[in-house]
UniProtKB/Swiss-Prot annotation:
This is Probable RNA-binding protein EIF1AD. The keyword RNA-binding applies. It comes from Caenorhabditis elegans. Belongs to the EIF1AD family. One of its GO terms (molecular function) is RNA binding. GO terms for cellular component: nucleus. InterPro entries: EIF1AD, NA-bd_OB-fold, RNA-binding_domain_S1_IF1, TIF_eIF-1A. Residues 165-175 have a biased composition (Polar residues). SMART domains: eIF1a.
Amino acid sequence: MSAATKKRYITNKVGSEFYELVDEDIIAQVRQSRGNNLHEVLDQNGDSYVVSMPTKFRKSVWLRRDQFVVVRPITEGDKVKGEIEYILDQDNVLYIRELGKWPTCFEENALKMTREAKRGQTSDKMIDDDMLPPSESEEEDESEGEETYDEDDVDDEEEEEFDTYNPNRMQAPSK
């Protein structure tokens, strides 16, 4: 596989698949980048440590601060205590939350990603009044406030024809 094909494959995989958590996986939030593909994360247990990004993600997927990742712990290193297994996008976060595997310490961040939070709606399942058709009482109220006009009330000035000029069609009409 060429480098461009690998990059395209990883980008499509991260953007289109839902990740299934394994028992040893830890969900963590990226706090800062340390450089050299090392990132400081805060995991679901409240521990802060450095994790490495594997070569399959390098130069194809970028991490931002406060983004969520799945970390697989490693035992080899002193400073680097895990490796990024998967980068979670918004859809994956909501999917894991639906499954009931989302950590409670990150619940507030997951709630901000829901459609209701983005629209500023609360959790009551009411339909907004603007989305409903008008009721009979509203139609009566509107008809009382409207003024009716007869044809005789219309000013004569409005009945005059206006000469329209379209520069793309012809010369301007001469008066």
